[in-house]
Amino acid sequence: VGQEFYGEYLAKTDPLGADVPNPVSHVAYGYATQMCVLDKKTGRIKKLVAAHDVGKAVNPLSCEGQIEGGVVMSMGYALTEQYPIDDTCKPTAKYGTLGLFRANQIPPEIQAIVVEKPGLNVAGGAIGIGEITSIPTAPAIADAYYRLDGQRRLTLPLENTPYAKKK
């Protein structure tokens, strides 16, 4: 809290419609950070803040929706989803038993912060807001639980949380 960090990475892309062999039309990088706030009494997530660098937000509302959707999807990965496989990597569970995150488990607040850096010399100034939305969630949640109870959780789904499947 109260700290600020700055980083920058610029990649060269060819202009849209450029007549060059093997044009570079887009870049695949991004910067994202997330913070999880737990209810100290229940251990459930009260709020998750997600800030994502998108370059130019061509459609800001859609960017926010992409962030929120990625956060919810990866909350399931972090907290409830089990995907058991056998030695041949064949799934051994039925879809309904995988522990997908449910609508009633979504925290009261997901704050999506779209960070723009206009003027980038890339395709339309946008650098993308896809898979990156789901990457920082599990570490943010694991760190919140560590700060709550001092216990490091190093496997997913995280154990000893109110969301964990009872054994």
What kind of feature is each model-predicted range?
Residues 1-167:
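C-terminal catalytic domains of large/alpha subunits in multi-subunit enzymes
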